[in-house]
Amino acid sequence: MAALRALLLLLAVGAQAAIRFAKEPYSQDALHGRSAILRCEVEEPAHVEFEWLQNGLPIQDTEQRFKEGSNLQFAAVDRHRDAGSFQCVARNVQTGEEARTANASFNIKWMETGSVVLKQPASAAEIQPSSTVVLRCHIDGHPRPTWQWFRDGAPLPDGRGTYSVSSKERTLTLRGAGPDDNGLYYCSARPRAVGSVCSQDNFTLNIIDESFPQAVVVPEDLIVTKNEEAMFDCQFAAVPPPTQEWLFEDSPITNRSKTTVFANGSLLITQVKARSTGVYKCIGHGQKGKALVLKATLRLAEIEEMAPFSPKVLTANQGHRVSCACPRGVPTPQVWWERNQERVPTAGRVYQEAEQLVFTSITEADAGIYTCHAANKAGEKKQELSITVATVPKWVEMPKDSQLEESKPGYLHCLSKASLKPTVTWYRNGVSISEDSRFEISENGTLRINNVEVYDGTMYKCVSSTPAGSIEGYARVHVLEKLKFTPPPQPLQCMEFNKEVTVSCSATGREKPTIQWTKTDGSSLPSHVSHRAGILSFHKVSRSDSGNYTCIASNSPQGEIRATVQLVVAVYVTFKLEPEPTTVYQGHTAMFQCQAEGDPVPHIQWKGKDKILDPSKLLPRIQIMPNGSLVIYDVTTEDSGKYTCIAGNSCNIKHREAFLYVVDKPAAEEDEGPSSHTPYKMIQTIGLSVGAAVAYIIIVLGLMFYCKKRRKAKRLKKHPEGEEPEMECLNGGTLLQNGQTTAEIQEEVALTNLGSSSGASKRHSARDKMHFPRSNLQTITTLGRGEFGEVFLAKAKGAEDAEGEALVLVKSLQTRDEQLQLDFRREAEMFGKLNHVNVVRLLGLCREAEPHYMVLEYVDLGDLKQFLRISKSKDESLKPQPLSTKHKVSLCTQVALGMEHLSNGRFVHRDLAARNCLVSAQRQVKVSALSLSKDVYNSEYYHFRQAWIPLRWMPPEAVLEDEFSTKSDVWSFGVLMWEVFTQGEMPYAPLADDEVLAGLKSGKTKLPQPEGCPSRLTKLMQRCWAPSPKDRPSFSELAAALGDSPADSKA
């Protein structure tokens, strides 16, 4: 019984572990040289590995065919390599269970060009007049094409009785062929799906009839100098003998003073001028057949000036090649090199190869003047080239550790020699030193520090370099510190009477100095005064403590220094009467009282509306009284504002502020007489106004506190790590900018179903405008799966207000996750708001049924990643026009412009990469968001903290702290630039995902400089990867920098 239960348990486990395919590969059409994909998915992918077989054998990843996730991706289908059946094998690594899909294969459509060959007779020599000639076209393809024959560029018309065409045999049969059938024969094929091609090596039929004129001597093209004679030889043969004539510019040539036609058919031209040059025709006429025309060209010899050379500096002990551009000339000039009027040999350590001067290993003895000569019948030209050989510098005097005295000039020597004067650069703590008021670098490389300071005591490096290389030396500077006060004591200091006061004195030197205080007059310090470690302490200041005191700092090697301080005993300023806020009627008198006491007696000064009131420049109605009060007569509204009383003596200053409020006198009170200048009603009115203002402020602060607390609770619930939302994110979530929320309530209303009825109606009207009928979509193919669901290509009727069909990208929402649904709506809202040539447009939404669809703009070449990979392919039949540096800069500039528009709209992408940009055949790039993280580009995403993230494109703050911003998009843009210049390579390809994550945490992971990438653009990438987001450039700066970048600058 127990055995039976165990067996049933094993069967149950086996039933649960059964592998079931969700998607299987199916047979399909494919074009040779174009991309394709075979898909394979299981319902439960946990612990399942995938393997692909071709004809039963495992497939190894190559550049053209590789596994992407569980799918088999073909960058370029090959009709030979990819023939046969493919099968997907899914294997559970825990249970060992294995399942296989049915076989699938490609129906590969292709076209291969070929030549036209003679099938009958066996050789061209056997062709006789009136015989049968059969030609065969060697163009083939699948599906089988249709053929057409041509002679001398014209298609052979149907229905002629002199020839027949066989499509089955791909042949052209000429019956009774004669001289009239002579010509160049070729064929073309028109397949059903691939495009038309023409034959490459074609057949020329030339049947000879004795009555037709035949060329015996063919005139040859001639190049002569001016006033030289030219002779064209021409002779024909036929039975009976043919007649012959010469034409120049289609005019017959007769015997004249400068042209002679001889009996044997030759033409002589004497004293050739420019007007004599051109095409000459020798024409033979036979009894039968067409006239035979032979052409020859007469040209004058000429040679242009040579382009001058720039002096060259070549590195010693290395191989070098110097080219001499051949000047244009007729005939083509001969080029050679000379040195010291001797021709450079064609072999040896220094030799000439074609038009190049070659140094196998250049030495200093090879420096000098080399001359490039070019000559033909028209004459000779030459240009001189100065070559300097650069050697690596050698030390004359290396930098040495030095002791420099503070506040005096100091020198560090760096003397070297080389064949070229070395360039000397000094570094301080690894940072290059630029010449300024403190540092000077002399012509021999010596560094002068004009005024040595204590912090100059550090490590210095000198680099001496030439084009051949560099040497470097180090020196540590020890500063001999002078004996000095740090800081020097203030010469006049105040002490508050009857208080405990300390006066400090500190000094430094080569040795720690001893510090003492004495009275300057030599008398001893009072008993209530003590000093210790440079601090002079007065336990209770008395009047007698005023006087001069001297601080003495000394050490044994440097002696002593002194500083005298005058101490003044004073009573600090205090206010007896302070100005108070005052409210008066317009036209009345206002008075601010201000009295202060201290010793010395304080001086009172007033400041009105941030300006000092000078008694000598005041208006007559404004007076400062002897007791310090400020009186303003006949006040106006312009007198309203802040007034400050400033009281000070030689030891301290204090101030107090008060406001003057000027109000209009009520009309009813103006008739009550002088006794009503300060009525109770005015005080009551002011009190009510102030009370209302205070109540308003309290209510606002209370509401702000309540809202902030509510938002914080909501934020903590939504963001467990406490980050604050800020801007819209393309892929969901909200972001932080400067620690403050931005447009939080507005965006919440715009992107959810909450809000007032009027707001809801506006949103519904906008959404109705974006509605797109699901019935107008016709699915073409699935591109892959992302977080939201399946992404596919479709034909859309009436898209973009067009009558015809358009190719569109459709993203489906197939998830029940509320956060992902919100992210889907946010993405649609974002693309609906953006309108830029380098950003894809939202064309419509399908929401009348599930799943919801987002219909986006699509372009013909697909995503930028695949485009870059194909452009790097070694298969010449696949590769489009090669990508130059100019093209790569253009691609990056367009992405920067699109992202500039996106960031200006306060959006953040969060997944910017080449895979998420689209490119057209015209190489126009558009920022999109395919995000095929589930299959096609699964290897470019990493599962981290319950989410799939593009780890290799993200900055540390986004990965580790979940802080996304425009500056995190800038980091991703730098990686995208790296992808463009490596043509689709994976960032950090040698590293596993865990190693990349560890590198981001430590800050040590760096992407290498792409091969052939200009240094200026490499520095721009490095700016994008600055550790601190605030140090990264904006997209506007990036677009401007790329727009100004010289496309062909050297790396």
Swiss-Prot record:
Tissues/organs with expression: Expressed in bone marrow, spleen, bursa, thymus and brain. Weakly expressed in fibroblasts. Also expressed in embryonic liver.
Keyword Nuclease: no
Pfam families registered for this protein in UniProt: I-set, Ig_3, PK_Tyr_Ser-Thr
Protein kinase domain mapped to chain residues: 777-1048
Gene Ontology cellular component annotations, sorted alphabetically: axon; cell-cell junction; neuronal cell body; plasma membrane
Disulfide bond in keyword set: yes
Glycosylation sites: 103, 202, 255, 264, 444, 548, 627
Membrane topology according to the record: Single-pass type I membrane protein
Annotated transmembrane regions: 686-706
Domain Ig-like C2-type: 23-105, 115-204, 213-298, 308-388, 393-472, 487-566, 573-661
Residue spans, topological domain Extracellular: 23-685
Subcellular location as annotated: Membrane
GO MF terms held by the record: ATP binding; axon guidance receptor activity; protein tyrosine kinase activity
Positions in the Cytoplasmic compartment: 707-1051
InterPro entries tied to this protein: Cell_Adh-Cytoskel_Orgn, Ig-like_dom, Ig-like_dom_sf, Ig-like_fold, Ig_I-set, Ig_sub, Ig_sub2, Kinase-like_dom_sf
Cystine pairings recorded for this chain: 40-88, 137-187, 234-282, 326-372, 414-462, 505-551, 594-645
N-terminal signal peptide: 1-22
GO BP annotations, alphabetical order: homophilic cell adhesion via plasma membrane adhesion molecules; regulation of canonical Wnt signaling pathway; synapse organization; Wnt signaling pathway
Keywords noted in UniProt: Cell adhesion, Disulfide bond, Glycoprotein, Immunoglobulin domain, Membrane, Receptor, Repeat, Signal, Transmembrane, Transmembrane helix, Wnt signaling pathway
Domain of life according to the entry: Eukaryota
SMART domains per the UniProt record, alphabetical: IG, IGc2, TyrKc
Function text: Inactive tyrosine kinase involved in Wnt signaling. pathway.
Family assignment from sequence similarity: Belongs to the protein kinase superfamily. Tyr protein kinase family. Insulin receptor subfamily.
Free-text comment on this protein's domains from its UniProt entry: The protein kinase domain is predicted to be catalytically inactive.
Protein name, UniProt field: Inactive tyrosine-protein kinase 7
Originating organism: Gallus gallus
